[in-house]
Each structure stands twice: as C-alpha cells, then as structure tokens.
Amino acid sequence: WIFMSNINNNLQYIQQKANSPATFVELCEGRYNRIIETIAKNVAENEKIEIIMLAGPSSAGKTTTAKKMREALKKNGVNSYAISLDDFYLNNCDAPRFPDGTPDFETVHALDIPFFYEVMKQILETGEADIPEFDFLTGKRKEEFNHIKIQDREVIIVEGLHALNPIITKELPSDRLFKIYINVSSRIYDNGKEIVLNKRNMRFVRRLVRDYNFRGNSVERTLEMWVTVRYGEDTYLFPYRHNADVKINTIHLYETCVLKDTAIKLLKEVKSDSGFYKESQRL
C-alpha cells in the first residue's frame, strides 16, 4: 500500500485554501486521520500482528503518527503500547564516534541493540517487560524503568529512525510484524513547475520551529545538527524504506502557512558572517 496520492501541492492551491484556515486544517487532518484509521482497521482484523514497526526520517511525524495509531487501534478494540527506539540509546560516553571523536548518534549502533532484543523477547514470551527511558539532558539512561504488561490481542508500536533496519528486526518474528514507513513525500510547486519547497526542506522547517520552541536550539545549532541528521537518514533509513508494508505521506499542506512566520523570523537572525548564512537565506 502507498498512501501518497490525491494531494494538490501547488502553491496557488495552498494560498486559496488558506483564506478559510479552519476548513483547510480540517481537510488536511481529515485526510491523514482516514489513512491511519484504514491501517488500524486492517491491523485489528489481522490477529497475527503483534508489533508495528514505524520508521521515518527526522520530523516526519513518527511520534504523532504513533499516537494517532494508538487512538485508531483503540477505536477498533485493540489496545497498544508505544516504545521509542530513542529510549534504547547507549549512554553518551559509550556512543560510537566519528573519526574526529564526536559522538555518532545517527548510526543504528548508537542503540543498545542486545538490550532491545532482550526486552522484545520478554514481551513476546511473557507479555511484560521493563522499558528504559533515556534522559537526553544528561545523555544517560534513567535508573527508573517503566513496566508494561500486555494482554491478549494488544499491540506494541516500535517507532524510530531505525525501526525498518534489518539489524533491529532480524530477531523479531516476521510473520507477527507490520511495517510502516512515513515521510514528507510531496514538494510544493509554483504552478506545477518550479519547486518552491522540497521534501527535505519541509521537514527541516518543522524541525527548526520545533527545536526552537521546545528544545531551546538556535537556528545555527539546528542547521549544524542537520548535516549529521541527513547522513543518518541516507545511510541507515532510506536503504530500508522498501521493507515497509505501508508508506504514508505525512505532509499537511496547511503547515506551510502555520510555520512560515516563525521560520522566516528565525532564519533572518543568522548573521552574515555565519557559515550557515547562505543556507539560511536560501531557505
């Protein structure tokens, strides 16, 4: 299945719909919710499925999609638990390193893979396990774990950049998995010709605003991190996206209207002597 069609991604269409913002938001959200509900219904009807693997690049909407999937599954009589692969990071001091000595948090080997296998084995065999939580402020796994106990016909949603990587999935029973890949898969065009915002830049704008509002990151810090983020996606995600059973386009056309003022304001703050000035002006 590929849920990517029937999207009018012309700038002129967006500008027209923006005149009725509430209706535009409802239209975009409705489209995405229907996709999630269709998938949830199919999962609920297939009793063999016990684990949903949900992968996507940075700012594709993994956490939001996992939340919506849980809600949609519940409507279909199936409870679920969400597990983030980010909580299986090795402590920063144990992380793999680039040749210059800086930590490589994008590689799949930045995760404690044997521990992930152990947790998933416990869930599948006993129905319960202690789930770790990673503290990104300290760069360490928290001492406290979250205990989960699943009942019959409950589903685990594992979300993360590496959720489709065979290194992560090879120890899991393939006949009990359902794999989802999400990404912004539409560009914004001017009259169907010139690209005014490509797919990767759309995700960057999402991340730029998110990191500023919720993580206290400057524009330059986000631009600096984006270099390694892109490396991680190109190396550890995109080669495995075709392993998915379903691919979903997570673009919400109204978001360009919502994010533009904050994004432009932030990008204008980059000084002319910055190494990121040219890129900020382009965006």
For each feature predicted by the language model, list its residue ranges:
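Hydrophobic positions on the alpha1 helix immediately C-terminal to the Walker A/P-loop
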Residues: 64-69, 84
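P-loop (Walker A) phosphate-binding loop of NTP-binding proteins
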Residues: 57
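Hydrophobic anchor at the beta1->P-loop junction of P-loop NTPases
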Residues: 52-54
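Conserved nucleotide-sensing/catalytic segment adjacent to the nucleotide-binding pocket
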Residues: 81-83, 90-139, 155
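Charged, amphipathic alpha-helical linker segments immediately N-terminal to NTP-binding catalytic cores
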Residues: 1-38
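Conserved glycine(s) of the Walker
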Residues: 61
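Conserved NTP phosphate-binding and transfer environment spanning the P-loop NTPase/kinase superfamily
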Residues: 21, 33, 170-283
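Post-Walker A helix-loop "phosphate-sensing" segment adjacent to the P-loop in P-loop NTPases
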Residues: 71-81
